[in-house]
């Protein structure tokens, strides 16, 4: 007796087409439209601009080598967005311990502080290698260097750190107080009569 599909094949094709276009296309367009309308800044990457020029994203760390700027956490990915990753080295790894010791000495010399005063976040890399934030303590240890490089009183730089500190916990539950390094450096430039874009400081994002 021959098999009969009784419309099963047709129904399966209709379901497949509906799933493909309904969920694969229509849902994506609707979700994109809603997020673009309600969260336009976040939907486009939380980009930060100076005079309509994109200088970075609030979500992605970038390197700052100029002494006039605050430095972010170290990055195993060299701040490369396409290679985001941590070092994946265990705490017992001799290479990790040697790198931490070297970084501790470098940061202490750079910021004029005792080696034991260097916060752990300035010694270790985040899981993504692109963490855009520091704790207030991670920013505060850099105030002396930044103030000296700019010829400003330390209190002026400290006030900007305080002003750009994001309160926590978020929604009353999540996170700790933090400072977005790019936002802080842009605030420094704004307070310093538009120094952004010079040297190796805040630059246009590519």
Curated annotation (Swiss-Prot):
KW Transmembrane (keyword) present: yes
Q: Which family does it belong to?
A: Belongs to the KdpC family.
**What's a Pfam family in this record?**
KdpC
Question: From the record, what ranges are coiled-coil?
Answer: none
Cite the record's note on assembly.
The system is composed of three essential subunits: KdpA, KdpB and KdpC.
InterPro entries according to UniProt? KdpC
Where would you say this protein principally sits, based on its record?
Answer: membrane
Transmembrane regions listed in the UniProt entry: 14-34
- Designated name of the protein: Potassium-transporting ATPase KdpC subunit
How does this protein lie in the membrane?
A: Single-pass membrane protein
Q: What does this protein do?
A: Part of the high-affinity ATP-driven potassium transport (or Kdp) system, which catalyzes the hydrolysis of ATP coupled with the electrogenic transport of potassium into the cytoplasm. This subunit acts as a catalytic chaperone that increases the ATP-binding affinity of the ATP-hydrolyzing subunit KdpB by the formation of a transient KdpB/KdpC/ATP ternary complex.
Q: Report keywords, A-Z.
A: ATP-binding, Cell inner membrane, Cell membrane, Ion transport, Membrane, Nucleotide-binding, Potassium, Potassium transport, Transmembrane, Transmembrane helix, Transport
Q: Does the keyword Iron apply?
A: no
- NCBIfam families, per this entry? kdpC, PRK00315.1
Compartment(s) of residence:
Cell inner membrane
Quote the cellular component terms of the Gene Ontology held in the record.
Answer: plasma membrane
Q: Provide the GO MF annotations for this entry.
A: ATP binding; P-type potassium transmembrane transporter activity
């Amino acid at each position: 007796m021959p098999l009969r599909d009784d419309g099963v094949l047709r129904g399966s094709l209709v379901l497949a087409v509906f799933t493909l276009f309904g969920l694969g296309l229509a849902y994506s367009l609707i979700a994109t439209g809603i997020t673009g309308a309600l969260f336009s800044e976040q939907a486009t990457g939380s980009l930060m601009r100076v005079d309509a020029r994109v200088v970075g994203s609030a979500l992605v760390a970038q390197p700052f080598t100029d002494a006039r700027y605050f430095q972010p956490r170290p990055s195993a990915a060299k701040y490369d967005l396409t290679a985001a990753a941590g070092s994946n080295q265990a705490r017992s790894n001799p290479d990790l311990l040697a790198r931490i010791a070297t970084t501790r000495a470098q940061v202490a010399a750079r910021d004029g502080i005792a080696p034991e005063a260097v916060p752990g976040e300035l010694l270790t890399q985040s899981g993504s290698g692109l963490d855009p934030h520091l704790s207030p303590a991670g920013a505060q240890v850099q105030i002396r260097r930044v103030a000296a490089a700019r010829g400003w009183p330390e209190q002026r730089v400290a006030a900007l750190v305080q002003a750009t500190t994001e309160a926590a916990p978020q929604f009353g539950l999540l996170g700790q107080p933090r400072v977005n390094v790019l936002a802080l450096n842009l605030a420094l430039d704004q307070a310093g009569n538009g120094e952004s874009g010079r040297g190796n400081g805040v630059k246009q994002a590519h």
